């Protein structure tokens, strides 16, 4: 397996990074990255989250940005549809076995009330959470080829 947690968005070519993980793995890949949800977009709009990860470069002074440089990276946020299109373009002959799950990490508040509110909200609107886990099974016994 190949696993990446909150690091692909530091690449200047995040799509290529995922495809390279898939290429070198034998059994599959697991990725946990930011999701492109309405709530994430609103958080960026109201400066509760970053569109470009300036904080990482400020913290480290000379690195932590795109390709670990001093240039803040764009925080690429993913959707299920984008992952589907990526793998369908890369290996169109395969019906890919992709599983998704959602989670959240709220950095902007320590308020228990706000955290409780979001817990309820995310229970109802699961896909609005700010984290997306993606598992792509590459096990040959689970692969199905398209019937053209």
Task: Give names to the regions the model predicted.
Residues 3:
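A conserved beta-strand element that flanks and buttresses the S-adenosyl-L-methionine
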Residues 6-11:
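A short His-aromatic
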Residues 12, 38-39, 105:
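Glycine/Thr-rich phosphate-binding loops of Rossmann-like dinucleotide-binding domains
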Residues 15-31:
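A short glycine-rich, Lys/Arg-flanked "PGG" loop and its adjoining helix->strand segment in the class I
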Residues 27-60:
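Conserved class I S-adenosyl-L-methionine
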Residues 62-72:
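Short glycine/proline- and acidic residue-enriched helix-loop micro-motifs
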Residues 71-101:
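Short alpha-helix
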Residues 96-148:
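Conserved Class I S-adenosyl-L-methionine
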């Amino acid at each position: 397996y190949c696993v990446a947690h909150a690091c692909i968005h530091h690449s200047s070519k995040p799509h290529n990074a995922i495809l390279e993980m898939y290429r070198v793995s034998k059994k599959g890949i697991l990725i946990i990255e930011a999701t492109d949800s309405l709530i994430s977009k609103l958080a960026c709009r109201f400066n509760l989250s970053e569109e470009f990860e300036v904080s990482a470069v400020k913290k480290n002074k000379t690195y932590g940005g795109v390709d670990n440089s001093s240039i803040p990276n764009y925080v690429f946020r993913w959707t299920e549809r984008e992952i589907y299109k990526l793998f369908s373009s890369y290996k169109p002959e395969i019906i890919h076995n992709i599983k998704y799950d959602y989670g959240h990490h709220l950095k902007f508040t320590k308020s228990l009330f706000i955290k409780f509110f979001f817990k309820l909200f995310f229970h109802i609107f699961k896909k609005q959470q700010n984290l997306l886990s993606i598992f792509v099974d590459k096990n040959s016994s689970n692969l199905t080829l398209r019937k053209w």
